[in-house]
Regions:
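N-terminal secretory signal peptides and thylakoid transit peptides that target proteins
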Residues: 1-20
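C-terminal segment of N-terminal export signals and the immediately downstream linker at the start
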Residues: 23-55, 62, 104
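A short beta-strand-turn-helix
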Residues: 53-73
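Short active-site neighborhood of thiol/selenol oxidoreductases, capturing the structured segment around
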Residues: 68-86
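Conserved helix-turn-beta segment immediately C-terminal to the redox Cys motif
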Residues: 91-111
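Thiol-based oxidoreductase modules, predominantly thioredoxin-like and allied folds used
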Residues: 108-121, 138-147
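Short, internal strand/loop/helix patches
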Residues: 128-173
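Thiol-/selenol-based redox modules, centered on thioredoxin-like
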Residues: 166-211
Length: 211
């Protein structure tokens, strides 16, 4: 696919090949530092990466930023176990991505899938779901309090400008956000894309991390 065509496609999806969460926050970094303000990285953390409490499929309590994202390369997507739409396809794609990335997952990159229906998706339900897709170590399935999940969804940009569409949880399950937190590199791509494309996109931020 030509670069121009790919950019147009990603634009239609509301995505971009590689974008900081908020480029406008990075511009005044020198002035902010001189004034003793927050660093660009801290601004991104404060605005887009809330440190909400979550539970893994193993019942472990974790905090989103401190335990899952800080100093890491991650993939982030939303789903729910009883989804009959595209969730299974996206999850199956991510399982293939995990296989393609191999030993990088759990070492260089960490995969996080977050339930949009925490009232149903208990750790036990998530564990069964993870097993169904043969998820390996390095891929965590997460649930939490509904208000915390909603804050996380909105902060990460999984939203629709139409309020009615935004209420529809199925509108927020088709994309995958990935990023290198310490380098402030964040992007997104369609979860229905080819696993090879997804893996290549994620590998880009891994290579950036290794210089």
């Amino acid at each position: 696919m030509h670069n121009t065509t790919r950019r147009k496609m990603l634009g239609l999806l509301g995505l971009a090949p590689v974008v900081p969460f908020a480029a406008q926050l990075l511009a005044p970094s020198s002035a902010a530092a001189a004034a003793g303000g927050l660093s660009p990285r801290d601004k991104i953390r404060q605005r887009y990466l809330p440190n909400v409490e979550l539970q893994t499929q193993d019942g472990k309590t974790v905090h989103f930023y401190d335990d899952l994202v800080k100093d890491k390369i991650v993939t982030l997507n939303f789903f729910y176990a009883k989804c009959e739409g595209i969730c299974p396809t996206v999850t199956a794609n991510l399982a293939r991505v995990q296989n393609i990335l191999g030993e990088h997952v759990g070492q260089d990159v960490f995969m996080h899938s977050i339930s949009l229906k925490p009232e149903h998706d208990t750790p036990a339900v998530l564990k069964e779901y993870a097993q169904m897709f043969k998820a390996k170590p390095g891929w965590t399935f997460l649930t939490g309090k509904p208000d915390d999940i909603e804050l996380l969804r909105r902060s990460l940009g999984f939203t629709n400008l139409d309020p009615q569409l935004d209420k529809d949880k199925s509108q927020h399950i088709g994309n995958v956000r990935y990023g290198n937190e310490p380098l402030m590199l964040w992007a997104a791509c369609p979860g229905m894309g080819s696993p090879e494309f997804l893996a290549k996109s994620i590998s880009w931020v891994i290579r950036k991390d290794k210089g």
